[in-house]
Curated annotation (Swiss-Prot):
GO molecular function: magnesium ion binding; pyruvate oxidase activity; thiamine pyrophosphate binding
EC number: 1.2.3.3
Protein name: Pyruvate oxidase
Region of interest (FAD-binding), residue spans: 192-342
Cofactor(s) listed in the protein's UniProt record: FAD; Mg(2+); thiamine diphosphate
InterPro entries xref list: DHS-like_NAD/FAD-binding_dom (IPR029035), POXB-like (IPR047211), Pyruvate_oxidase (IPR014092), THDP-binding (IPR029061), Thiamin_PyroP_enz_cen_dom (IPR012000), Thiamin_PyroP_enz_TPP-bd_dom (IPR012001), TPP-bd_CS (IPR000399), TPP_enzyme_TPP-bd (IPR011766)
Binding locations of Mg(2+): D447, N474, Q476
Source organism per UniProt: Lactiplantibacillus plantarum (strain ATCC BAA-793 / NCIMB 8826 / WCFS1) (Lactobacillus plantarum)
Annotated cofactor note: Binds 1 FAD per subunit.
Xref: PROSITE patterns: TPP_ENZYMES
């Protein structure tokens, strides 16, 4: 008897690649077509109803937007570039993803297999280019295994919370492979279970907190799900809270015992308290300036909670470490304590925060004088929805947004945290609106950062992404100019540039826009922008002064360390006549100033 043979069905390898992406929940990706990536473009065209191609105007924007996808959602972001320059243009965004530990997949075009290693047009050995940025970096060598390679790349990106790069010779996706041979492992992928907090370690940590005279809780984005526990522990034990800048908003900015963040992108109360604390509890924190700033020189006990064993003891010698989830560990601490009476340390910090916030409000509420960033950010706060998302570029805008944006746990904000590449504002806003179309999205950028990716305002228009873009124009790289003031011996160099009228740039890509240079213009213009952004993107170009924001890391307020003339000059320059140092409130509540004691080098 002759068995009837079933006819084998085939599928294009490129179609299988797209189906693997779909299986992992990818619903859009970014890039620019090229001859070496056209086979993937062909497959995308066939699946356009299920996965959307977003055409950016520079591959860098695609990679930055993919990184922003991952930062906002936790899901993998995907971008692509053609062989040679298309792929290398992705690098800034890929490094941003690597440094902020988020999963991104980059597909790189390559000349067909018959022309590889022949010095053909735009053909080169691409693997070494991506060796540093990627946790997984391979070139596909045959069509049959191509879907598996893509699946493996995604699993590795998730597992390592980093970048995966796959170079794809252009002929492979057009080849037929057996339809039953490809699969995606998305439905079987699992994240590791987080360790439970060790009871004895939690007890020791709790006892140390209770014995402290000047305790401080310093949390990072690893505590993103523990906002309620952080605030409750702070209230119960009367411990002030401070965060890294990326963790802003985990606890509402309005919380009276929230001090802000430290170092330079900082708020004054945080820097001052950190220098005085005797016990610091690090929660999900990888503060990158600990070693260079000597932030913990008066710290007697350093405590740490983290899910990553590599982080324990990384930034400071740690006395008690708990390898566990932040939320569970904080809940375990709360279970061991009861509410304490107010302490002098607690009262001094509350008073210092109140004084600092009054200073910030005095800048924001000015009704006359030249337009400054502070009044513009007040206008942003006025029209912001409770769950607004902010994509913030890099530079002085980080420092000012850190101080003047009023965030709660309902908000999200993203920037390039550790890599700190300029130009991320526009790409991040594109990603935010694609992922959360129902939420209000702001792009906040200085003119330096905005000029790096301004061509992709056109992408917002093309895909009808109603972003409110606010550009802070002062014709300088302000953050670097301020550094030069502190470090250089000679005049400023390379930090000032000619004006760009961003309202005209926006008009050129068919986006409604405004240009303002007076405080009194802000209310009406921002209300108009909010109305426009119900349906389409809009841009406000705010021409502001080049004033340096108050340097919280270089305070001249305390008579123990600064002359009366220096203090007066500092207050005049930064409009800070009523601003007081923490030492004023320490003295008021009967505490010594450890920071300024002669010979004080720790406990």
């Amino acid at each position: 008897m002759v068995m009837k043979q079933t006819k084998q069905t085939n599928i294009l390898a490129g179609a299988a690649v797209i189906k693997v992406l779909e299986a992992w929940g990818v619903d859009h990706l970014y890039g620019i077509p090229g001859g070496s990536i056209n086979s993937i473009m062909d497959a995308l065209s066939a699946e356009r109803d299920r996965i959307h191609y977003i055409q950016v105007r520079h591959e860098e924007v695609g990679a930055m937007a993919a990184a922003a996808d991952a930062k906002l959602t936790g899901k993998i972001g995907v971008c692509f570039g053609s062989a040679g320059p298309g792929g290398t243009h992705l690098m800034n965004g890929l490094y941003d993803a690597r440094e902020d530990h988020v999963p991104v997949l980059a597909l790189i075009g390559q000349f067909g297999t018959t022309g590889m290693n022949m010095d053909t047009f735009q053909e080169m050995n691409e693997n070494p280019i991506y060796a540093d940025v990627a946790d997984y970096n391979v070139t596909a060598v045959n069509a049959a295994t191509l879907p598996h390679v893509i699946d493996e790349a995604i699993r590795r990106a998730y597992a390592h919370q980093g970048v995966a790069v796959v170079q794809i010779p252009v002929d492979l996706p057009w080849q037929q492979i057996p339809a039953e041979d490809w699969y995606a492992s998305a439905n079987s992928y699992q994240t590791p279970l987080l360790p439970e907090p060790d009871v004895q370690a939690v007890t020791r940590l709790t006892q140390t907190l209770l014995a402290a005279e000047r305790p401080l809780i310093y949390y990072g984005i690893g505590a993103r799900k523990a906002g309620k526990e952080l605030e409750q522990l702070s209230k119960t034990l009367k411990i002030p809270l401070m965060s890294t800048y990326p963790a802003k908003g985990i606890v509402a900015d309005r919380y009276p015992a929230y001090l802000g963040s430290a170092n330079r992108v900082a708020q004054k109360p945080a820097n001052e308290a950190l220098a005085q604390a005797d016990v610091v509890l690090f929660v999900g924190n990888n503060y990158p300036f600990a070693e260079v700033s000597k932030a913990f020189k008066n710290t007697r006990y350093f405590l740490q909670i983290d899910i990553d064993p590599a982080k324990l003891g990384k930034r400071h010698k740690t006395d008690i470490a708990v390898l566990a989830d932040a939320q569970k560990t904080l809940a375990a601490i709360l279970a061991q304590v009861s509410e304490r009476e107010s302490t002098p340390w607690w009262q001094a910090n509350l008073a210092n925060v109140k004084n600092w916030r009054a200073y910030l409000a005095s800048l924001e509420d000015k009704q006359e004088g030249p337009l400054q960033a502070y009044q513009v950010l007040r206008a942003v706060n006025k029209i912001a929805e409770p769950d607004a998302i902010y994509s913030i570029d890099v530079g002085d805008i980080n420092l000012n947004a850190n101080r003047h944006l009023k965030l709660t746990p309902s908000n999200r904000h993203i920037t390039s945290n550790l890599f700190a590449t300029m130009g991320v504002g526009i790409p991040g806003a594109i990603a935010a609106k694609l992922n959360y179309p129902e939420r209000q999205v702001f792009n906040l950028a200085g003119d330096g950062g905005a000029s790096m990716t301004m061509q992709d305002l056109a992408t917002q228009v093309q895909y009808h992404l109603p972003v409110i873009n606010v550009v802070f124009t002062n014709c300088q790289y302000g953050f670097i100019k301020d550094e030069q003031e502190d470090t250089n011996q000679n005049d400023f160099i390379g930090v000032e540039f000619n004006d760009i009228d961003f309202s005209k740039i926006a008009d050129g890509v068919h986006m409604q826009a405004f240009r303002v240079n007076k405080i009194e213009q802000l209310p009406d213009v921002f209300e108009q922008a909010k109305a426009i952004a119900q349906h389409e993107p809009v841009l406000i170009d705010a021409v502001i002064t080049g004033d340096r924001p108050l340097p919280a890391e270089k305070l001249r307020l305390d008579s123990a360390t600064s002359s009366a003339a220096d203090i007066e000059a500092f207050k005049q320059r930064y409009e800070a006549q009523d601003l007081q140092p923490l030492s004023t409130y320490l003295k008021q509540f009967g505490l010594d100033d450890l920071q300024h004691q002669i010979g004080q080098g720790g406990f």
